[in-house]
Amino acid sequence: MAKPPEFDIPELSDFLNVPTVTEDTMAHSQPYVAKEVHQEALGFPGELVDDWQNVAVAKLGELTRKYRGLQVYLDSCVKCGACTDKCHYYLGTSDPKNMPVARQDLLRQVYRRYYTVAGKYFPKLVGAKDLTEDVLDDWYKYYHQCSQCRRCSVYCPYGIDTAEVSMAAREIMDTVGKGQKYCNEIIGKVHKLGNNLGLPEPALADTLEGLEEDVEEETGVTVRFPLDVKGADVLLVTPSADFFAEPHIDGLIGYAKVFHQAGLSWTISSHASEAANFGLFIGSYDNMQKVALRIREAALELGVKRIVFGECGHAWRVGYSFLNTLAGPFDFLDPAYPVPQHIVEVTHDLIQQGRLKLDPEANDDKRVTFHDSCNVARASRMGDKAGGQFTLPREVIQASCNHFFDMPSGTIGEATFCCGGGGGLLTDDLVELRVKGALPRMQALKDVNDQHQITHMAAICAICKSQFSKVFPYYGFRMDQIISVHQLVGDALVLGNNH
């Protein structure tokens, strides 16, 4: 059990309650501010610049001109209220500034003041405000209480994307010298060493060698975990969490078993040993592109034919939606395969071809449900049919175990609730927010558990898996009840002479 918290933990009940509005319940919550070294490594000022108000207003204008969608989102809200009870952070904290419309308004009120005629001449009439230190403080607090999950945009009749507003606000804050330590420090590690953990090549090689020994000892089969192998067919780009921690590492073992049994040559790159791209979270195109280009460089250097992403939600969004724009064209890869592919797509295709033999009885000790990760569910897809991001993972799970049960329909698929730790919030300085933000998913898990006695919840996102490992004990679940989809695959896979 985790250390007793210094905050009230929401209680699970028979159904998810919409809380009564309580002002400023999370006004104390904010992440650590980035140090000078973390800011400057990303091309941002090391501290708050002297003329920060003018710099921020100018940056806001630049972003609305550059990203027309952002301007539409700031102009088009009609205050219908459809989004108010859709945010997991509002449901878990009751703070009205965690309603999506109120979160948007923190930026919208400044936009109106400086970039609309009504706001310039009649600010009080249209809710426009000057950019002051108090407003900047609210930005820093509440734009770091948004996991950019985009659930609110599903229910907005105008499709307003609060995630885009949040990203813009964070980019403005970085530009004036007030960035978030957690995200910016991690991006700096990727720029320097190629992964979020700051693992150098020797440490990565030692880790993979140890995994080979562990798998051979357990199975009697030599399953390779290749590193920097030139001429391999597949470049696997996976979250660095897969290299060091449970339950992630069991997913990596599952990938390796799949590649081994299918007879696919593959490799990891020490230059691009990270699928995650936190540049997305801070709204920085330049930093997002710099991270993505490492993947292109590795693919060219190693001469691979395919790029496959591991189990990471936002990494798959960047890969599926933006990789070609950021780092393309990828005309040097095999045109027979999409660029990139998700490991679930690869495994699903191999199962359909009959190239993998699975024994679902190997997982008969498990009764499994599945958490749809936000960036997979609402910002990408899989396969060649609409909704593949929902069906493919479930079909892979059902091929690997006999006891699978979905959570309630309003909490999965396109309507899935966030884990509570995405969007650059997976840091212990925001643990209260993370625990409270997990409430809707924990309620859904309780509901399916009450009916079907669930033992495990599977996910295909490194952030989700890390988040649930942390918050499960707060709600009476065991931290080891969260597992990787490819742990199920790996445990069910019958190893032998590969094809």
Predicted segments, located by residue:
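Ferredoxin-type iron-sulfur electron-transfer modules and their immediate structural context
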Residues: 1-142
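Iron-sulfur-cluster electron-transfer modules
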Residues: 58, 64-74, 104, 108-326, ...
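Short cysteine clusters
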Residues: 77-83, 87, 146-152, 156, ...
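Iron-sulfur (Fe-S) cluster-binding segments and ferredoxin-like electron-carrier domains
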Residues: 85-113, 154-173, 381-384, 424-438, ...
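Cofactor-cradling patches in redox/metallo enzymes
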Residues: 159, 243-333, 377-388, 392-399, ...
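Extracytoplasmic substrate-binding proteins
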Residues: 174, 295, 325-333, 347-363
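Short hydrophobic beta-strand segments
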Residues: 233-243, 366-377, 458
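C-terminal amphipathic alpha-helical segment
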Residues: 343, 349-398
